[in-house]
Amino acid sequence: MSRRHSAEKREINPDPKFGDLIVTKFMNAVMYDGKKSVAETIVYGALDQVQSKTKQEPVTVFHQALDNVAPHVEVRSRRVGGATYQVPVDVRPERRQALAIRWLIAAARNRNETTMIDRLSGELMDAANNRGTAVKKREDTHKMAEANRAFAHYRW
């Protein structure tokens, strides 16, 4: 990481099917080894499954799931006089989105369904309904921040 200047943000084109930037970011996070067509198949397949099961617009369910998973506060380690404190800090909007995407995909990959499309659609529907592993991860993060509220004055 350069100390002179921060890296410039790359421009991302919205996905062709829904015209949504966040779906593209999600697709890029699902992608392994540069295989974008495989990632597209997985994400679009999962969103089609969500639409057929919930009878709702898949992108709205997707955004609802992301909102339900995105953390508002997290803890960061801060060393003060030989002791390390877990200090609660607010999460920036870009990081909130990145964490939500990361946690949703990790939770989907750990599910027991046979195909990734089934796992991802199941996790998206669970997250949209405030259930599932990704939502539990957010709740745990919030609990950690709440438990360490006494150290909030160490914020930097």
Swiss-Prot record:
Domain of life per record: Bacteria
Any Gene Ontology biological process: translation
Key words of the record: Ribonucleoprotein, Ribosomal protein, RNA-binding, rRNA-binding, tRNA-binding
Pfam families associated with the record: Ribosomal_S7
Transmembrane segments annotated in the record for this chain: none
SUPFAM superfamilies in the record: Ribosomal protein S7
Keyword NAD (UniProt): no
One GO cellular component, as annotated: small ribosomal subunit
GO molecular function: rRNA binding; structural constituent of ribosome; tRNA binding
CDD domains per UniProt: uS7_Bacteria (cd14869)
Keyword Ribonucleoprotein: yes
Protein's job: One of the primary rRNA binding proteins, it binds directly to 16S rRNA where it nucleates assembly of the head domain of the 30S subunit. Is located at the subunit interface close to the decoding center, probably blocks exit of the E-site tRNA.
NCBIfam families the record matches: rpsG_bact (TIGR01029)
Record-stated family: Belongs to the universal ribosomal protein uS7 family.
Protein name: Small ribosomal subunit protein uS7
High-level lineage: Bacteria, Pseudomonadati, Pseudomonadota, Alphaproteobacteria, Hyphomicrobiales
